[in-house]
């Protein structure tokens, strides 16, 4: 997914974001106001990735395939599509988003442009689930739940090139930092609640 990918919002939240972009672009044209549009991946902070519902069987029981697997004990879900590919998602740590916003501030070459901001790379479920299992001591359940798989990445090449955007927080770093934050350790993590 890059800046030229057609915007096709599904749901009210996505529609509100698309409409806001259009309003900003219109205002920029009519009033000459310099505007830069930053499109964020799903933003997580303060260890929110640790509680991500799609990682836990107990939180995904609304899916009939997964509900049948519930035996009363938590399991981490290593979800894959019908071809056996682990799900893939591209998220962003709030620290990288703050960095991206800072990179865009005052950069004339960014005026009138749209940029994707996300973490350094997308993650696959196996990357996240194996690390979570090791750290939380929760067993893994490998499942192909059917339906539309989660499998996408954002292209952040333009933001890297034009803005100097250099995200640092991959999924493993987000998990490790989130757990350290929960233990009360001194981290640079940003609370989001």
Segments predicted by a language model, with ranges:
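Alpha-helical substrate-binding/gating segment
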Residues: 58-114
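Amphipathic terminal alpha-helices
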Residues: 171-193
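Catalytic loop of short-chain dehydrogenase/reductase
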Residues: 1-14, 44-56, 66-69, 78, ...
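Glycine/proline-rich active-site loop of Rossmann-fold NAD(P)-dependent oxidoreductases
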Residues: 18, 30-33, 45-66, 103-115, ...
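Residue-level signal for the nucleotide or nucleotide-sugar donor/cofactor binding architecture
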Residues: 11, 15, 89-95, 123, ...
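Catalytic helix-loop patch of NAD(P)-dependent Rossmann-fold dehydrogenases
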Residues: 1-37
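Conserved SDR Rossmann-fold cofactor-binding beta-strand/turn motif
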Residues: 37-44
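Mid/C-terminal beta-alpha module of Rossmann-like enzyme folds, strongest
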Residues: 88, 98-147, 156, 189
